[in-house]
Amino acid sequence: MDTPQKSITQIGTPISKSRFEDSPVFNYINSLSPIRPVRSIPNPNQFSSLNFTSPPSVFTSPHLTSSHKESRFFKTHNSSSSDPTNSVESQEDESTSHEEVPAEGEDTKGLNIDDCMREEASVETNLDDSVASPCGGNTTDLSLVPYAPTRGEDGSCEDNGMELQKMHDNVQGKTETPDWESLIADASELLIFDSPDASEAFRCFMMQRASNSEARFRNGVEKQTMQHDSNKEPESANAIPYEAVSLLHRGIRRRCLDFEMPGNKQTSSENNTAACESSSRCVVPSIGLHLNAILMSSKDCKTNVTQDYSCSANIQVGLQRSISTLQDSLDQTENEIREDADQDVPVEPALQELNLSSPKKKRVKLDSGEGESCKRCNCKKSKCLKLYCECFAAGVYCIEPCSCIDCFNKPIHEDVVLATRKQIESRNPLAFAPKVIRNSDSVQETGDDASKTPASARHKRGCNCKKSNCLKKYCECYQGGVGCSINCRCEGCKNAFGRKDGSSIDMEAEQEEENETSEKSRTAKSQQNTEVLMRKDMSSALPTTPTPIYRPELVQLPFSSSKNRMPPPQSLLGGGSSSGIFNSQYLRKPDISLSQSRIEKSFETVAVDGAEQMPEILIHSPIPNIKSVSPNGKRVSPPHMESSSSGSILGRRNGGRKLILQSIPSFPSLTPQH
């Protein structure tokens, strides 16, 4: 291909439309359209400067100049949406590329190859700058304004130039503002956080202070914007440095993109008035939610915000002063409300209303029987005109707490209520009297004093208890805390407050009698217990098999031989083992009884001094009341004793058989042994 040589040889010669469209240079220029690369770059989230750069220092003074700060906010707001500079550039190049074709259709008034090559070089330079920028083509060089072709036929290029001039003037006007104040003015949207609660709280706090000066502020905005637009000077030759723009995006993208709410971003079509209104929403310098408290804690925290570029208004906000004035106003209003309440509402009714909810007050009202408190009736068919309606019986009207249906016990039906009361009183004069009547107010129905209940009060109708003995809550007398009276028809009354058939003295006497009877029963039981113990001891002292008792007529027992006779008792006492038997047979009372062991030990002494030691009771006749019922006594027969000169103890029978008696175990005696 030798197209470059042809283009060089044909420089300065006019060419036709068909030859120019077929030239490779025209095709190459059309392929280098800047619209596609510029529109594919403006996504700010694809760069990692937000993640890898450290946040700026908070407590140190701002390091960037005022122009850098203002440009930083301007660039960041437009980076997420459509960049105004990129749009201007794209419109410029697009208008250039589109206007060349109709110009060639008109045989292009003096257009040559040098103009096309110059335009190609400018497009390449602009593309390289946009690609080399780390912020996605946001650093547009404003020096491209002179290269924009101006055509007045359709006005498209002139409109683009005016838009670019307005944007540049806006940037230049922002650079003239002070450092800290302009940072606050353009950082108004930084205080719109993702959290709706935080934004709402901050908005409520600031709108109280700024609501008064909002009207004056807008009036100043309208006046100053007109003067500011008339005093503008075109400074399109100045350009923003590349390093400054890159630093702007590094420093501000971290705060705006993460904390800014969508829909509240500035666009390139906003005018100066809208910008002034948006910046006037926040006039307080702020660092962050967690550092605002440190900034506001200073005593003399005042900020002078001067907005020269938009309205040249001077707003002075004192945080501590505004808070103190707000607190003073609140205290003043509270004091006024208290004074009004003290003057209008008396103290005693208020205290009574507060005391209505206390249980003691309710209890006193219920006990007093006065119809002051409504008991919240629940009538459905009686229309609250019967005695079982507690409100009607108490003489009060039904109020809101009552859940009655079709109620006539209200002030609007006063005539019906009074007529019903008179009709009921004509039949029973005490119908509407209190249930519990005190002694001072009670009237004796009979002349006897005994008819009066000894308790402090009595029930007007009385109870009708049958099985509860007036000791349960459904007894009206017991429930009212009064004793039963003669009017009561109860049975087996045991009312603790007073019985209907007696006085309190009788009740005390009955209680004393009950106590005495209980004591007597206790003593009787103790005596019975002692007697039982004594009987047990006596029964244990007697032998298990008592021997038969001999009477005087039985002293001479019949024997087989009439010659043999029983020896006298003196001879019997001298015997060995048999003497114990007869001795035990003669014992009649426990106080003179002797144990068998002791008798066995003193056999010899008894034999010697038998006549002297014999008790008199043994000589006399025995007691005939004791009878022998032991079968052993019937079988045992006394042995035949033969008198012998030797005085032998053992006797012999005729048959030569000996009587062998087993030893009887000894039993303890009841009397002490000496």
UniProtKB/Swiss-Prot annotation:
PANTHER family, sorted: PROTEIN TESMIN/TSO1-LIKE CXC 2, PROTEIN TESMIN_TSO1-LIKE CXC 2
Domain CRC, chain residue ranges per copy: 373-498
Keyword vocabulary terms for this entry: Developmental protein, Metal-binding, Nucleus, Zinc
Swiss-Prot/TrEMBL domain comment: The cysteine-rich domain CRC binds zinc in vitro.
Protein name according to UniProt: Protein tesmin/TSO1-like CXC 2
Cellular component GO terms, alphabetical: nucleus
Feature: compositional bias, Basic and acidic residues: 95-109
Role played: Plays a role in development of both male and female reproductive tissues.
Compositional bias (Polar residues): 1-16, 76-89
Knockout consequences: No visible phenotype.
Biased composition (Acidic residues): 507-516
GO MF: DNA-binding transcription factor activity; metal ion binding; transcription cis-regulatory region binding
Keyword Glycoprotein: no
Family: Belongs to the lin-54 family.
Gene designation: TCX2
Region (Disordered): 1-20, 69-113, 504-529, 623-655
Tissue-by-tissue expression: Ubiquitous but expressed mostly in all the aerial organs with highest expression in flowers.
GO terms, biological process: regulation of DNA-templated transcription; stomatal complex patterning; stomatal lineage progression
Main subcellular location: nucleus
Subcellular location: Nucleus
